Amino acid sequence: TNVKESVDITFGVDTEAETKNVDSCLKKLHLEQGKYNLWAIPMPWFPNEYDEKVHGNRYKKLLDNLSEIAYNQHLKENINVFLPFYYDMDMGLIKDMVEKLKLPYVICDNSKALTLGEKRALFRFSNCNICMRFHSVMFSIYNGQAGVFISYSDKTSNVIRMMGLEDYLVEYGIRNSADFYKEFDLDMQRVNQVMDNIFSDDKKSIEKITSKMKQEAAVAQEELIKWLK
């Protein structure tokens, strides 16, 4: 069989928006480079799973913890931009967050008409990325931007550690039946340490990893095209 082993090119190959119209996402949202915090945060529990009596207190605590991050000295002067990944699932959490924060915000809802490439480019030009989905963590890394990488699964944690970026890693245990197979909340002392790491780092470490992975992805893309031909 004609099977080719390759690195994953999903994240590492730039979209047209990232290479040619890199600031179009900022123009659409009326943002300035480095003047916004990008949030990619999910509702931890599925709609058919969430039970206010069972999960309500943990959900409220998560909102409190995320709000505390927003008021961190490095973030509080910037606009908060919320990017839903699973729209119907994430919008409820986002609306609860903006109501709680009382800070300037932009929600990347369907009316903003951002392309996939423009959404990816948002990770590049932010002041800080707060990522709680695997794809958002990868988009941040591939755009050379450090962030608060909140992992709720071994998969995400292992990838972050493999890349040598555990200085940005925080973990969150959603449920006993999957992922880390235990429930635990955000360690805010750890979050504050990560925040200090982000804003004291010269970013050379993450930029080196970004460059290496983009090179690998480019080679893999060429190999894929040859293989398809």
Q: Can you say where each PLM-predicted feature lies in the sequence?
A:
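Active-site anion-handling motifs in enzyme catalytic cores
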Residues: 1-229
